[in-house]
Structures are given as structure tokens and as C-alpha cells.
């Protein structure tokens, strides 16, 4: 886009500007001392070619020009207000800057042959307008020269006529919309096609060259063409009006070109004409003749036909013929030439009303919108206009569709509750309790939750008095019915399948211990709090019956002496995955416990609930005396507690296996809690194994021997004891191992900087199973007797290897197994110190070989 940058420094166009060859900016020729009669071939501005320029003089010249133009504008405004007639007012020097020519208009040759731009006047006689000034709007189809660089406005020319009120809408001439052609231009396919045409001959003198003129068209809306072709005389039918010129191609070429959008419009674009005698197309959008301004409409009065002119059969020529009688000053209108399958043809006058579905209606609306963006019907009869009929049809169809939807919606709303039976909501259909209480909730979800809680409270009143803090202790005990518990039929108001149980008033205020809390072997709170598994369903014996109270002599105590269950329940809970339960099938082999036994667990449920259903997660068991494959889908029994002898610093206690309990002499002893359960209460420990790729039937272990003389260690592989295996296949229980256990050093050897320092973060950790406790017992009992290592009651003499015979090695990077061994030794050392601090006297004790930490077993 051109830009004026002058030394004056005004940026408006005075009608005579010149362009710099280097930076392509425009400057006022008067400001740079250039005369209209002496225009240079090449011009460079003061910045590209520095030279002295009088900027003050240039500023005064342009300022005087602007003052003259303002005076002229005031004179014109006074003349228009005093007289509405069209008058001509001439200025002294040039035209108004508003309507002055742009730098891209008109080409003339100066005195020295230089190309320059000059403002031109263009007028057209007729009844539509009086005078029109030179065009000021650029047009893509206007011819222009690539070498145009300078513009000039001759000062001696008469001033331009101003725009009058009658013609102020049309600011440029129709000549700027096209390039006049002397003859048609044919494409290769059109030229080949035209050789085989059989057309009539026409004499050139028969054509009415001056029968029409181009006039501006006043349109109510914007359209692509602002001009039309109007007859100046009476034209009879079948009369050649004028020749149509342009670029000639075939219809196949035109339709296949995507820019023509024929697949959407279904008709030629404006200034494009289809020949009625052949398959040729005349494209006059860029170049052509005055006939290109013939608009199209539904009531056409002309058609384009191809003929041979003056007996020449070389190439055809295209003539605009009149089809009807055309009166003077009547617009020449051509045919739309719609496609044969165009849907607009169904809306022509005399055709029956078409029917379209909603999808076709939307497509029709899109075609109409696109078509009207390029075209405008030139017919004055809008009632018979195809586009008006299509527009009305689309609007009526949409209104009918909207009215149909509204009527359907009204029909749905008209269905009142009185005419339609009301469907109660799920919450309303639920039976309410006979005695309304505060537990009845408003919402459906809260109602069922409160009903669920109420049924639990009525079935198991002892839940009210249980502790509320989390407990991680599993206590195994045999069921014992309370004498004060009576059965009651299910409550009909709540429609609960669970039996409601009331507590006797005599024992309601009595403080019961959890160790004395017994329940029926078939019904417990765990049945209510946990889902029923298939195994539990198979074990049920049908409806509940009144249980008989067993005699106290028949109940075998499972709680070790001096064990306070209530105190244990108040301690910190442990993860339920660290202590898997034992399958009842294992217990049935060696224990008289029946399947009626329940396990009091409070890990995920309320405290004191009797759970008949074990966790379904599968875990491998490490057994001392049993190699069978456990059944984890059945009930299991497990117990863990922490004796007071093993209190550690901080709030994180270590778990102690239930087989370690105190005798009457306050000494810890490793033995089953009862002789009758010695086979079932085996040492069942499990570590959380991250790597589950352990091979079955593979026995791996290593003995770690420590020398108390210098604290060095030797890691020698050895065969693991027979009773300690990862095998899951059922194997008969072998006798206890008799191989000597590894020697564990005393506290003095642990302190001699042979192991990592006692980091509280390492020592204050949570023991995962009974191996740590067994090693703790072994270490604590070897404090007073460091040379005695007890394995199954037999004393093993320490090695006589001297300190000099033992190999010494430089510090090296520890492996994962070595690091775990050292960390566990530090833990055991800290536990021994804690036991001594509490005044516990350790004594030799028999430790199974399976309790020795296996470095290959991953925590």
C-alpha cells in the first residue's frame, strides 16, 4: 500500500506526488522542487539521496493549499444549503483532497517519457446521473503498469466537477471493473471443441452496438455488481444486442475448477455466461465488453448464443440476443442457467410444492445463503422470484418444526399428577419405624445407613461399650455365650434379616472384659460388618437356634497368664497384612478347635467384632513345623501381643509372637500357650515380600558367624534347616533340626565399630514379624552368657578360632543382604539395652533355628 512521507510534513495527497525508487515512499512534487513539465526518470528521496531541502517552504506551500481547499468546502456547503438544484462550483486550484486521485490510477506519458499518474475525469451521459469524478477506489481488475512511479496533476487543467447529491452513491466508473478486450481468448480444450460446431452466420452490421448503456444500479443491499445494462431504445425479440467477450472455456473446465464453487452454487457466477448453443462458457469477470454488466434474474429477457461472424468459421463469437420485447430504459436480464438437478428448479412458478426433510432443509438453506452472497436477482417481480420462494419455504418449515416441538412440550406439561398415577419415590415407599426416632434420616442414603446402624446396635449391644481407638491386636479365643444374651426375632419395622439381641438389665451396667466376651459360633458382628463370602455361606447351618452355654471346664483358655487383653487393645494397631491368619485345615490336624471359632479383629472394623471371614489376600506362610499348603479362604486364627518386658523407646512398639509369654516367675518362655494347641500354635511369620519370584522347593539360607574377639564376620552358605522352608507343597512335618545355630556375638562385639552406628531412625522402626523378636530374645539371653548359643535346648560350644586366624578385610560397600543383617543386629542390640534398662534378667533359652534371620528373605 502506498504511503506519503514528505518534508512538509503533511500526509494528504495534493494530486501531484512522486515515488522514490529505493524506499518506495511518495512525496509531494512541489515540496521537493519538481515541476510537472520536468519529471525525472528516476527519483530518490532526501533520505536515500541526501541533499538540501527547504522544509519551511514546503510547509508553507502545503498549508496554503489546505486553506484554499477549506474555503472551497465552505462555499460548496453554502451553495447546497441555499439551493437544492445541481450546481457546479469550480475551485481555483485542483479538486478536493477527499476525491483526489490515488497514486495507482491512470497512466500517461510525461514530456520526457517518464511514467506518471494523473487524475482523470470520467462522466457518462444518461438519466441516472449528471457527473462522476475520477475513481478513488482501487480495483483488482483495473489495468496498471509495473513501472508507474510518479503522478502528476496538470495545474492548467480545469477543476474537476464535484459530486452532486444525485450521484454521491457512485464514486467510480464502470470502466474500472474490467479490461476491455478486442477479441476472445480461448483455452486449448475450448478451441478444439469449437472446431466441430455447426453455427449460423451473422453479419456484424446486424448487431446493435449502441442499443444499451451501462448505468449504476441502486441496490438495497450490498452485491457484487453495482452496475447494470439498460436499453436505450426499443428492442424487438431475437435481436442481437451486443457481443459478449471474455475468456472462453468448456463447461467441464469451469465446473471442475474449485474456485468457481459450482458444486455448491449449481450455477455460474456473476459475469459468467453459459452458451445456449454449445458447451462453451464465456468468463468476463476480469476482461470483456460492456455486455458483462448484464445481470441475471428469474424473469430473463436475453440469452447468450454462439454464432459465426461475417462468414468466418474459424472461431465462434458470442452474441447477446433478446428473447422478448424490450422497452427503452429497461434492464437487460440474463438467465440463471441453473443445473438440471438444482433444487431451486422445483420452486419455479407452476411447479408443485416440494417436500424436504429437516436435513435436506438445512442443506437447502446453506445453498441459498451461499448463492445470495454472490448474486442478486435483477427481476422486479419478487413474488415469482425463485429465491424469495425458497426463503419463504425455509422460514415456514422452520416455524412449523418449532411449533411442533412446542406442541409436544405442551402435551407433556399438560399431563398433571391427577391424570397420571404418581409414582412414589424410593424413600417414600420405604417403611418407617413404628416408633419414630432421631436416627430416621431424610434422604434415602442416610435412611439406609441409619437403619443399618440401628440393626447392628439391636443385634449386638456390647458394641456400645467397646473402645473407640484403633487396635491392631488379634486375640484368639474360643466362643463362649454370655448368660445374659437372649435371642430375639428380627424387627419387622426395619425389615432386617439380622436378629435383634437385647442385653439383660442385670448385666447391662456390668463392665465386661473383651477376654470374657463370647458370642455364638455362627453369628457375630463380623457377619454384619463384612460381606458374606461363599465359604461362610457354606458353613452356615440355616436359621439361628438357641445356643447352649458350655460349661466353664470345657473351655480351654487361650490367653496366656498375666496377659491383659484390654491393655493390649489400647496400643497402636499393626498392619493386617503383616500377620496372616492360619487356615483351619491346619488346626484341625493337631488342635481340637472347630470351625465355630472366631477371631476378634479390629483392624478394619469396630473393636471387639468377631470375624468369621478371613482376609482373602493370599500370603505365603513360613512355618516351623508345618509344610502344608494353607487354605486362605477359610477361617483362620492368629494372635499377637506385646509383653511388657519388651518396651522400646518412643511410641512405636515391637510386636511379640503369642508363643512368648510369662510364667509365674516373670520369666519369658518359648512354648505354646496350651499343650492341646502345641501343634496348631506354631511359629507363623510372614514378611511383606516385594519380589514374589521366590522359587518353590528351594531352600536357601546362610549362617552368619561372628567372632567376639575382634568382631569380624564370615558369611558362609549353609543348608537351611528342614523345618524352615518356602515350599508350599504338602510335606509331612520332619523332626526338629539339630544342626548348630549360628553364633551371635555379645553386646561388646556389637559396639566395637564393626556395624553401623545406632541411628534412632533405624532403631525406631516397626518389626514386621516374629523373626526380629526371636533374634531379640536370643541376643538378650546371651548378654550374661556370651559363649552359650542355645539351639533346641542344646549348648553349642563357640569356635576356638583365634583372632589372628580370622581374615580381616578393608571396609567395602555393603550389599543389600549385608546391610539388612547389620541393621537387624543394631536393632537387637538396642532391644537388649532396653531390656536391661527395665531390669529384666535374661537367661539361656532355646531358640529354633528357623528364627535366625535369613538374609535371602526380603523384607
Curated annotation (Swiss-Prot):
Pfam families found in the cross-reference section: PHD_5 (PF20826), SET (PF00856)
Positions of the SET domain: 210-337
Span of the signal peptide: none
PHD-type zinc finger span: 5-51
Ranges of biased composition (kind: Polar residues): 95-111, 565-576, 701-719, 779-807
Job description of the protein: Transcriptional regulator that acts via the formation of large multiprotein complexes that modify and/or remodel the chromatin. Required for both gene activation and repression. Part of the Set3C complex, which is required to repress early/middle sporulation genes during meiosis. Required for the transcriptional activation of genes with high activity.
Protein name: SET domain-containing protein 3
Native source organism of the sequence: Schizosaccharomyces pombe (strain 972 / ATCC 24843) (Fission yeast)
